[in-house]
């Protein structure tokens, strides 16, 4: 999810770039929360990446991301998420909360009341964003 969502911010960085970037492309942790980074439609952002690759004869696109997805994040691409149940105090709970809003508490309460297993080998859930 973080990788897919990071594509938007990489496209924003590349929208007016014609020459190869030598020091590497990275999306920093809090970069998505800067209002100046939400300037393109998602499709335009992906097209900026493709144009950059074409202009520089690149067949492979390499970048890094450090973004944290927390409440207040505006999702650009993802409407559904399959994930396991995360421990309290995990930053991954921030991602779930950002994705489903306050419903995360009801989801986790239900999981705990019904003895769902948590962590990597535990139960998983399919979450949908409320698009209204």
Protein language model regions, located:
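Surface-exposed, charge/polar-rich loops and edge strands
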Residues: 1-132
């Amino acid at each position: 999810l973080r990788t897919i969502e990071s594509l938007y911010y990489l496209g924003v960085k590349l929208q007016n770039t014609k020459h190869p970037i030598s020091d590497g492309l990275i999306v920093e942790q809090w970069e998505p929360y800067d209002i100046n980074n939400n300037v393109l439609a998602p499709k335009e952002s992906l097209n900026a990446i493709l144009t950059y690759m074409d202009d520089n004869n690149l067949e492979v696109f390499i970048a890094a991301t450090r973004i944290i997805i927390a409440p207040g994040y505006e999702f650009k691409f993802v409407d559904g998420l399959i994930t396991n149940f995360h421990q309290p105090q995990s930053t991954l709970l921030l991602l779930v909360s950002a994705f489903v809003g306050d419903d995360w508490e009801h989801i986790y309460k239900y999981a705990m009341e019904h003895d769902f297993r948590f962590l990597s080998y535990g139960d998983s859930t399919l979450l949908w964003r409320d698009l209204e």
